[in-house]
Amino acid sequence: MNAVTETVDLQAPPPVPLVFTDSAAAKVKDLLAEEGNPELKLRVFVQGGGCSGFQYGFTFDEVVNDDDTVLDKAGVQLLVDPMSFQYLVGAEIDYKEDLEGAQFVIRNPNASTTCGCGSSFSV
């Protein structure tokens, strides 16, 4: 009887990149149309501050840096710098409208705690 040996690669799967929802892309597209500058992209970043240690930020940017992560969705580009990306891997960037108002929302699986307003977190 012959033994069969099989090699199995047990490496962890690569991290899930950011999820940029259709709703968020549509809202950004509307905002960019209002700005009237086709070169603008949405930059999402993480910086120190907020009540939980880190906070999210959004800004429009014309410049794509060499080390940026770029996500394209529905004709909209989302930019994330490398430092921020490490905190956002696997996160979902969404836009919601409900009775509490309308806002961009980041659902981040890396955040161990978040504040009530949802704009700051800790890891």
Swiss-Prot record:
- Report the gene name: erpA
SUPFAM superfamilies cross-referenced by the UniProt entry: HesB-like domain
Known role: Required for insertion of 4Fe-4S clusters.
Q: Which GO terms describe its biological process?
A: iron-sulfur cluster assembly
Keyword annotations for this protein? Iron, Iron-sulfur, Metal-binding
Cofactor remark from the record: Binds 1 iron-sulfur cluster per subunit.
Instruction: Write down the PROSITE patterns for this protein, in alphabetical order.
Output: HESB (PS01152)
Question: What name does the UniProt record give this protein?
Answer: Putative iron-sulfur cluster insertion protein ErpA
Q: Which domain of life is it from?
A: Bacteria
A single Gene Ontology molecular function, please?
Answer: 2 iron, 2 sulfur cluster binding
Q: How does it assemble?
A: Homodimer.
Q: Where is the signal peptide?
A: none
Source organism of this protein record: Bordetella pertussis (strain Tohama I / ATCC BAA-589 / NCTC 13251)
Q: Which amino acids does the record list as binding iron-sulfur cluster?
A: 51, 115, 117
